Curated annotation (Swiss-Prot):
Subcellular location: Secreted
InterPro entries the record matches: Glyco_hydro_22 (IPR001916), Glyco_hydro_22_CS (IPR019799), Glyco_hydro_22_lys (IPR000974), Lysozyme-like_dom_sf (IPR023346)
Keywords of the record: Antimicrobial, Bacteriolytic enzyme, Disulfide bond, Glycosidase, Hydrolase, Secreted, Signal
Pfam families: Lys (PF00062)
Protein's recorded name: Lysozyme C
CDD domains from the UniProt entry: LYZ_C (cd16897)
Superkingdom of the source species: Eukaryota
GO cellular component terms given for this protein: extracellular region
High-level lineage: Eukaryota, Metazoa, Chordata, Craniata, Vertebrata
Signal peptide: 1-18
C-alpha cells in the first residue's frame, strides 16, 4: 500500500512538472509550427521573446494584481485579452481558448494564439519583454547552432 502511494505521488509530480524547452529544441519546434517569418517576424525574435517571457517554460504563469489578469505559458499570453481562465474580470478571449491550453507541453495552441496576437496593430510590440530585451538587438545567439 505504501509503495502505491509513493508511486502515485511520483506520477502526480511528473504530470504537473513543466516542460522547459532546450533552446534549439524550441527553435526547431517554432520553425516547424510556421513561426519563422510569420508576419515578418524572424524566428530569432520569437526565441528572444520566449526566453525573456518564460525562460522557455510551458507552464509559466504570472499574476498581474493591477487588472487581476494572468499571463500564461511560453509566450506569457494574457487572460485579459487573449484566453479564458474563468477568473479575469472583463476578459475578451480573442484566441477563443482556455488559458490552460497555453500551459501544455504541446505548444501548438500557444503558437496559434501568439500568431493571433501579432495580427493586431501592435504586432510583436504587444510583449513588453520583447520591447525591453529584443527590439533593435542582435538576436543571432537565440538560434545559433540550431540548424534552423
Amino acid at each position: 500500500m505504501k509503495a502505491l502511494i509513493i508511486l502515485g505521488l511520483v506520477l502526480l509530480s511528473v504530470m504537473v512538472q513543466a516542460k522547459v524547452f532546450e533552446r534549439c529544441e524550441l527553435a526547431r519546434t517554432l520553425k516547424r509550427l510556421g513561426m519563422d517569418g510569420y508576419r515578418g517576424i524572424s524566428l530569432a525574435n520569437w526565441m528572444c521573446l520566449a526566453k525573456w517571457e518564460s525562460g522557455y517554460n510551458t507552464r509559466a504563469t504570472n499574476y498581474n494584481p493591477g487588472d487581476r489578469s494572468t499571463d500564461y505559458g511560453i509566450f506569457q499570453i494574457n487572460s485579459r485579452y487573449w484566453c479564458n481562465d474563468g477568473k479575469t474580470p472583463g476578459a475578451v478571449n480573442a484566441c477563443h481558448l482556455s488559458c490552460n491550453a497555453l500551459l501544455q507541453d504541446n505548444i501548438a495552441d500557444a503558437v496559434a494564439c501568439a500568431k493571433r496576437v501579432v495580427r493586431d496593430p501592435q504586432g510583436i510590440r504587444a510583449w513588453v519583454a520583447w520591447r525591453n530585451r529584443c527590439q533593435n538587438r542582435d538576436l543571432r545567439q537565440y538560434i545559433q547552432g540550431c540548424g534552423v
